[in-house]
Swiss-Prot record:
Residues 511-531 are annotated as: Fusion peptide. One of its GO terms (biological process) is symbiont-mediated-mediated suppression of host tetherin activity. Residues 460-468 are annotated as: V5. The gene is env. InterPro entries: Gp120_core_sf (IPR036377), GP41-like (IPR000328), HIV1_Gp120 (IPR000777). GO terms for molecular function: structural molecule activity. A lipid is attached at residue 772 (S-palmitoyl cysteine). This is Envelope glycoprotein gp160.
Length: 860
């Protein structure tokens, strides 16, 4: 029984020690390299801040370094706040540049229109027949820069744009009178009862909005980059095989700004993109057939569009403050045309080969059965035609000839590009009327860098169509789809065995390397334990970066505060500044509510909420740990706040006691007021005690049958003094115990009363003295008893220590015996396994020999 008791005692002792020393407490870390996805507004930076669209942007000095992170992150170009903001912002810039000012009432009036007849004999392109000429060869379909037809505007397929001359009645400045106005419309923009003459209306007049251009801003190219506000950052997937959707990208870099991008608004093709490389690659939607194909810049693909002829614009006043721009045209303006240059056939063949090699592609591998096709019939003009904008004019180009050309098929004619004023909005549902276009001759030359397309695979997988698309937003999936916006969360929780924070100042080592605003993110791929030692420098770097970016934003806002209404960037700059300040103040308020203000490592008294959840300080990163404990942050935060409130209460009570440590505080004026209060309380207590004693004495005398002499009413003075012989024995009195009080009869009753009070107080003090003396007399036995108890406890502890030592030796011997038995068992098992494996191997090696012997026996 004795060894069993010793073992049980050892187990209980070890368990108690583990409970005391192995408890885990919440520790707050500030400056950890962790983040979460965010969706806050970005702001822009550009080198050219002289244009109207980028005047609110920060100056771009190309000082945007990227830091490699040793982490794995998910990227999605279609579920991405960066690309969504780019689409929204470019749309607002587009709207502002083309029509930044006044909304006019839709021109839904009946117009008497007739077709404009030109002075030339050029056939109407709508009625021209393809049988008037033989199908040209592919070489003849290319217009060179030196062709005479370009200078003379007589190239094949280049005709006049059909116009309609219309008249309508409307009130002008004089509201009581109607005036008749004349206007010229493109034939495609009006709907008439009769194609030659009759009543016509502006197409989509009930769903269109006319917006006038104030300052002749046109949709010119603008280059800028997005930057994250302070406290946020941008991650980029640097994997070469990234195709728009990657749940586990291993090559991740951190940056404060994106690459430089250029505004694009077109269908079918993307122009002047910044992602073109010496290869063709495809961004493919994760759950759809939508793609954006980046073309190889080696083939030098270009498109040059031109609108020849003169064009003038004449304003017509409809009413006060409302002006409609008419187009008086002496001769019909010529249609626009576009010429494609470069090695297009080779580029399109490489697109097909890249599609076949794409991991998402499940169709036929024969590139000869992969064709480029146009969208189906019945689509909007922006879908059916290639739509682009050339300095104010909206061109709709029929690309049938282009598809035949790149597929090396015979073509019947080369089509032109229509010019329209009423177009469908590419970002929102609706139609807009854009007025006025730029006067004079227009020419645009762009580099074709991408194709917007849908991959349509036949059910039987016999052929595949690459269908051109009108999703303008896909252009920005390619430009910014490899970025994602994150919010840096520098506050983290982790369990440690330290319960209190040590306020001992620590001297920082010399030569701390400051990494910059994103420098601490470079440690995101390192272990938690290694990075906890550098949190001080990281938090200082984070704060310095926030302050620096705040100052830059504030300078821009101050310089351009009178022009914030012009573009979307002014509002974004203000919002980015406010967001950064709110984020920093929120973090400091949180740390302060937990009692951890301005501390990098703050130990608390709050126990860790989940003992089974513990970090691997040597192998786990802070980002991995934060993903595991993110659901516990609310409970931990609440517990820390409650602990801090209790700590403040304890500190308040402790400070009240500390005020008595200094002798000077005892003589403070405020202390004397307290002393007076204490004195009043003592006097009141004495009076109450005397009243109680008086009542007790009165009751005692009543029990003895006496009526006290001093019970007479106040103010009564005895005139007859009773002189009693002091020498008379006590037993001669008429009452018992009267002799003891004979001394009080010599005085009148008030003096007797005072003597009685003094006598009672003396007896009270003597009683207290006797009690204290008795207690002190009993102190010696108590001391002897305490000494004996301490001796017994010491002997008991020595006995238990000996038992603990014996138990430890017994456990050590048991472990040694267990290890010896295990080693012998494993050695025997290994020998048996080795013998069995050897026999099986010999049997397998003997199989061919047995087969040969069996065959020989069978042949015999």
């Amino acid at each position: 029984m004795e060894p069993g008791r010793n073992q049980l005692f050892v187990v209980i002792l070890l368990t108690s020690a583990c409970l005391v020393y192995c408890s885990q407490y919440v520790t707050v870390f500030y400056g950890i390299p962790a983040w979460k996805n965010a969706s806050i507004p970005l702001f822009c930076a550009t080198k050219n801040r002289d244009t109207w669209g980028t005047i609110q942007c920060l100056p771009d000095n190309d000082d945007y370094q990227e830091i490699i992170l040793n982490v794995t992150e998910a990227f999605d170009a279609w579920n991405n706040t960066v690309t969504e903001q780019a689409v929204e912002d470019v749309w607002h810039l587009f709207e502002t540049s083309i029509k930044p000012c006044v909304k006019l009432t839709p021109l839904c009036v009946a117009m008497n229109c007739s077709r404009v007849q030109g002075n030339t004999t050029t056939p109407n392109p709508r009625t021209s027949s393809s049988t008037t000429s033989r199908p040209p060869t592919s070489a003849a379909s290319i217009i060179n820069e030196t062709s005479n037809c370009i200078e003379n505007n007589t190239c094949a397929g280049l005709g006049y744009e059909e116009m309609m001359q219309c008249e309508f009645n409307m009130k002008g400045l004089e509201q009581d009178k109607k005036r008749r106005y004349k206007d010229t419309w493109y034939l495609e923009d009006v709907v008439c009862d009769n194609t030659t003459a009759g009543t016509c209306y502006m197409r989509h007049c009930n769903t269109s909005i006319i917006k006038e251009s104030c300052d002749k801003h046109y949709w010119d190219a603008m280059r800028f980059r997005y930057c994250a506000p302070p406290g946020f950052a941008l991650l980029r997937c640097n994997d070469t095989n990234y195709s728009g959707f990657e749940p586990k990208c291993t090559k991740v870099v951190a940056a404060s700004c994106t690459r430089m991008m250029e505004t694009q608004t077109s269908t079918w093709f993307g122009f002047n993109g910044t992602r073109a490389e010496n290869r063709t690659y495809i961004y493919w939607h994760g759950r759809d057939n939508r793609t954006i194909i980046s073309l190889n810049k080696y083939y030098n693909l270009t498109m040059r569009c031109k609108r020849p002829g003169n064009k003038t614009v004449l304003p017509i006043t409809l009413m006060s403050g409302l002006v409609f721009h008419s187009q008086p045209i002496n001769t019909r303006p010529r249609q626009a045309w576009c010429r494609f240059g470069g090695r297009w056939r080779e580029a399109m063949q490489e697109v097909k080969q890249t599609l076949v090699q794409h991991p998402r592609y499940k169709g036929i591998n024969d590139t000869g059965k992969i064709n480029f096709t146009k969208p189906g019939a019945g689509s909007d003009p922006e879908v059916a035609f290639m739509w682009t904008n050339c300095r104010g004019e909206f061109l709709y180009c029929n690309m049938t000839w282009f598809l035949n050309w790149v597929e090396d098929k015979n073509q019947t004619r080369r089509n032109y590009c229509h010019i329209k004023q009423i177009i469908n909005t590419w970002h929102k549902v609706g139609k807009n009327v854009y007025l006025p276009p730029r006067e004079g001759e227009l020419a645009c030359e762009s580099t074709v860098t991408s194709i917007i397309a849908n991959i349509d695979i036949d059910k039987n997988r016999t052929h595949t169509n690459i269908t051109f698309s009108a999703e303008v937003a896909e252009l920005y999936r390619l430009e910014l789809g490899d970025y994602k916006l994150i919010e840096i969360t520098p506050i983290g929780f982790a369990p440690t065995d330290q319960r209190r924070y040590s306020s001992t100042p620590v001297r920082n080592k010399r030569g701390v390397f400051v990494l910059g605003f994103l420098g601490f993110l470079a440690t995101a791929g390192s272990a938690m334990g290694a990075r906890s030692l550098t949190l001080s420098a990281q938090s200082r770097t984070l704060l310095a970066g926030i302050v620096q970016q705040q100052q830059q934003l504030l300078d821009v806002v101050k310089r351009q505060q009178e022009m914030l209404r012009l573009t979307v960037w002014g509002t974004k700059n203000l919002q980015a500044r406010v967001t950064a300040i709110e984020k920093y103040l929120k973090h400091q308020a949180q740390l302060n509510s937990w009692g951890c203000a301005f501390r990098q490592v703050c130990h608390t008294t709050v126990p860790w909420v989940n003992d089974s959840l513990s970090p691997d300080w040597k192998n786990m990163t802070w980002q991995e740990w934060e993903k595991q404990v993110r659901y516990l942050e609310a409970n931990i935060s609440q517990s820390l706040e409650e602990a801090q409130i209790q700590q403040e209460k304890n500190m308040y009570e402790l400070q009240k006691l500390n005020s008595w440590d200094i002798l000077g505080n005892w003589f403070d004026l405020t202390s004397w007021v307290k002393y007076i209060q204490y004195g009043v309380h003592i006097v009141v207590g004495i009076i109450a005690l005397r009243i109680a004693i008086y009542v007790v004495q009165l009751l005692s005398r009543f029990r003895k049958g006496y009526r006290p002499v001093f019970s007479s009413p106040p103010g009564y003075l005895q005139q007859i003094h009773i002189h009693k012989d002091r020498g008379q024995p006590a037993n001669e009195g008429t009452e018992e115990d009267v002799g003891g009080d004979s001394g009080y009869d010599l005085w009148p009753w008030p003096i007797n009363y005072v003597q009685f009070l003094i006598h009672l107080l003396t007896r009270l003090l003597i009683g207290l003295y006797n009690i204290c003396r008795d207690l002190l007399s009993k102190n010696s036995p108590t001391r002897r008893l305490i000494s004996q108890s301490l001796t017994a406890i010491r002997d008991w502890l020595r006995l238990k220590a000996a038992q603990l030592q014996y138990g430890c030796e017994w456990i050590q011997e048991a472990f040694q015996a267990f290890a010896r038995t295990t080693r012998e068992t494993l050695a025997g098992a290994w020998g048996w396994l080795w013998e069995a494996a050897r026999r099986i191997g010999r049997g397998i090696l003997a199989v061919p020999r047995r087969i040969r012997q069996g065959a020989e026996l069978a042949l015999l």
